[in-house]
Amino acid sequence: MAQVSSEHSDRSPEFWRQKADEYAQKGDFVNQAVALGNLSLALQEQGEWEQAQESSTQGIQILQQLSTTKERDQILAQSLDIQGKLSFSVGDFSAALVSWQEAGKLYQQLGLTEAEDRNRLNQVQAMQELGLFQSACEAIGARIDENVSFCAGVKLENLPENLRRFAGDRLMVLHLQALGDTLRLMGDLESSQQVLELGLELVDGDTETFDKLQLSLGNTWRAKGDRQWAIAQSATSTIQFNFEFCPILENQEEYDSALKHYQNVSENNPLLKLQANLNQLNLQVALNQNILDFNPLEEAQNLNLFNTQSGNNLILNTLQTATCISTIPWQNIAQNLQTIIDVSQQRKDLKTQSYALGYLGRLYEQHAQDSKEYLQTAKTNTQKALSIAQSLDLNAPELAYQWQWQLGRILEKTQSPYSEILSAYKAAFNTLQSLRQELVSSNRDLQFSFRDEVEPVYRKYVDLLLQNNPSQDNLKEARNVIEALQLAELDDFFNDACITAQESKLEDIASDTAVLYPILLDGKIAVIYTLSDSLIDYTIEPLSNPQRFERTINALINDLKEDINNNYQQYGQTVYDSLFSDKLKSFLSSHDQIKTLVFVLDGQLRNLPMATLYDGEKYLIEKYALAVAPGLNLLAPGSLNSLDLRILPGGLAQKAPSFDLVHARLNPLSNALSELESIAQLFENQTPVVLDESFTVEVIKSYFANVYYSIFHWVTHGQFSSNPEETFILTWNERLGVNQLNELIQSQAEFSSEPIELLVLSACETAEGDNRAALGLAGVSIRAGSRSTVATLWKVDDRATSEFMSQFYQEMIENKKTKAEALKTVQESFLSGEKGEALRDPRFWAAFVLIGHWI
C-alpha cells in the first residue's frame, strides 16, 4: 500500500503534482491523496506554505468523500499528520493539535500502536506550545504507566522499576523525554530530572535519542539554576526599578550541570548540536563567561532555519543573546531580525512576526544613545509588534505586555506627553493582571523573571500615578496596583497563581483604622494612606541614598535580634522619619479617632516590626495598635466571635528527631508546656495539649474528626524565608513545608468550611540574610487559610514568650480586645517594666507581629 511519508520528500514538487494528476485521471483517489500529501511535504521543505496547505487540504477532502476502509483510514490518518506538521511549522498550534488528535483516533481504531505513539508525541508538542501542560502530562504519563501519578505536582520519590522494560525501545524512551520536558514546563524540576535521567539509562546506543535527552537534561538543569538564582536574588538583592537589557546571572552549581549536558550533545545531528550550542551560548553570556567560538547565525542559515517556526524561534533566541555580545555588530542582528520578519509574513506566522518586530524595537531602544532617530524606529517597530500581539488572529497577552512596557519606556525617553506614557503603563499593568497563570509558568517562551521583568512594571506605574498632583482616581489606582504587586509576589513565591483575591471595601473598615501602603520607588519612598470613608492621600519622600536606607533597616533588624548594640532607637527614628512625613503626621493628629494602623508593607520593610519605629519620644506601638496585612484584598472575611473559639495547643518541649532535619543547632523549648497549659485554661471544653511525641501530623488530624478548631497555637521551631523550600515548621518527626502545613490545617475543612480564626507560631524566626524572609510568613498565613497569624520574627527567650502569649489571650478572650489591641497592650506592659526591668528591651517584645486581620 502506498504511504504518505517524509521519506519521499526528496522528490520534487513537480514529480508529485504529475503523480497526483495521473492517479486522478485513473480514478485512483486513494493514491491521488497519497501523492497530494507527499506534494505538501515537498512544498513544506521549500517553504511554499500556501501551496502546501492547498495540497494537504485537497488530499484530505478527497479521502473524506470516500467510503471507510482500512486503507483509506490509514492514508487519512497519515494525511492529517502531515497537515498537523504544516500547521505546527507555521505556528498555528491549535490547528496542529486538532489535526493530530483526529489522526490519533484513527490510528487507535486501526490498532496501529507505533503510529499512535508517534502521533502522541506530536500532540504533546502542540500542547506544550499552547501551555496545556497538565493535558500533555496526562496524555504522555498514561501511556508510560497509568498507575503512576506523574502529574499530581507531588515529588516522585522513586520511579517504578517496571519502567526499565522500555530499555532499547526508542519510541517509549522518547515518551520519557516528552514527560520530562512537560514536568519541567509544569515547574516540577526534580521529577523532570529523574525521568530524563532514567531515559538516558535506557537509550541503548540510539545516538539521536541520546542527544535529545542530553539537551532536555541541560534545559532542566538550566531551569533549576534559574530558580536558585531567582531565590538568591530575592533574598539578597535590592529592588530592580528599571529594565535591564543584559541581566547578569550569578553562577549556581546547577548551571555547571546544564553546560555539561549541552556539551554532551554529539555532532551527529547538526540541528540538535546547534540547539545545544545556542543554549550553551545563552547561558555563558548570561554568566559573563568566555563564550563558544562559533558563528550561530551562519550555522542557522546553513541549516535553513529561517523557513520554519521552530527554526525562527532558535534564531530569535540567538539574536537576543547576540545583543549582549559586544563583538557582534548590532546592525547585523537587526538585518537578521528583518529577515525573520519577512519570512514570517510570507508564512503568516503572526507570533514569530510579533516577537521579531518587538525585539527589533528593543534593539533600537538599546542603542538609542547613538541617534535620536533610533528611538522613533524603536517606537514604530514596537507599535507594530503590539498591534499583531493584540490582533484577534493571535491574541497573545504574554507578548502584548512586553511591548506595552517597551512602548512606555520609549515614550518616556522621547519625552512624550505624560498621558501617553501613563496609558502605556496602564495597558501593561492590565495585561499583567490577565496573565497570572502564565507568569509562574516554567515554559521558556513564557517564563518571566519576576524581579527583572514583572516587578518594575508595577513600581513604575505607581510612580507615574503619583506624579502631577494625582487625582483621587489615580491614588485609588495606585493603591490597587500595590495590592496587585503583593499578590504577584506571593504567586511568584509559591510558583503558583493559586491565591484568590477579592476586592476589599474600605467602607467595611472601622473608622478608627487607617491603612498605610509604603512602597519603594526609584530614588524615593511613597506612602499612600486611606481611611474607611475612602479618603485617600499620599506622601513622597526622596531617598538621596536608597542603599543607605536599606542598610539602616538591616542594621535596625540586626540590633533587635542580637544583644550587641543599642542603636535601635536611632535607626528606628531614621526609618520613622522616612515613612511618617510632616503631612502624614498632621493627618494622623487631625484624625484622633484613629486607634489602629494597618500596614501593607513592601520590600525589606516586611522584615521590620513596625512597633519599633521611634519618633524621638515614643515607639509607634505606644500610640497605635498595629497589624500587617499582605493586602486588604487577601484578608478573609468575618469578625472574631470569642464565644465559639476552640484551640488546639501543641508543640515541642523536648529535643525532637526533627531537629536533625535542619542545619541550625536547635534547643528544646523547655517552657512550651507551661505556655500551652496556661493558654488552654482560658478556653472551655479544652482539648489536651498535643506535646512532643504526640505532636505529629497523624495525631493532629485525629482531633479534627470530632471538633472544629478555630485557633492553632503551636510552640515549635520554624523558619520563614523568601524561598518556600526553606519555609517550614517542625513537628516531632517531620519538617513541614508551607504546602504540607497548608494541607494539614486545611484537612479539617472536611468537617467545616469556616476559616481559621488565628494561627500562632511563637518560636519561629526569619531566615538570616534574607531581605524578603517575611514573605514566607505571609505565605504561611495565606496558605493556611487563617484570618490572622501571630508569629515571631526572631527567636525570643521562651520564658518571656510564655508570659507574653498568656497575657495576649487574656486580653483577647477575657477583656474582649481586638487582636491588634491585645498585642499592643502586652507589648506596652513589657515596655513599661510591668514584666520586669530586663524585659523592657524591644528584643523581648518587638518580635511578635500580627499578620492579617486585626479585629
Predicted regions: what they are:
Residues 525-529, 679, 848-849:
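Short beta-strand scaffold segments in enzyme catalytic cores
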Residues 1-38:
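N-terminal leader/linker segments that initiate helical-solenoid repeat arrays
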Residues 117, 125-128, 133-165, 169-573, ...:
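Alpha-helical solenoid repeat scaffolds used for protein-protein interaction
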Residues 499, 508-509, 603-711, 726-730:
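Catalytic-core domains of enzymes
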Residues 41, 85, 522, 603-607, ...:
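Solvent-exposed loop/turn segments at secondary-structure junctions
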Residues 592, 801-855:
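An often Trp-containing, charged/polar helix-loop segment at the C-terminal end
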Residues 31-45, 75-89, 121-125, 177-181:
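Non-membrane alpha-helical segments in proteins
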Residues 630-633, 710-803, 807:
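Catalytic cores of nucleophile-dependent amide-cleaving enzymes
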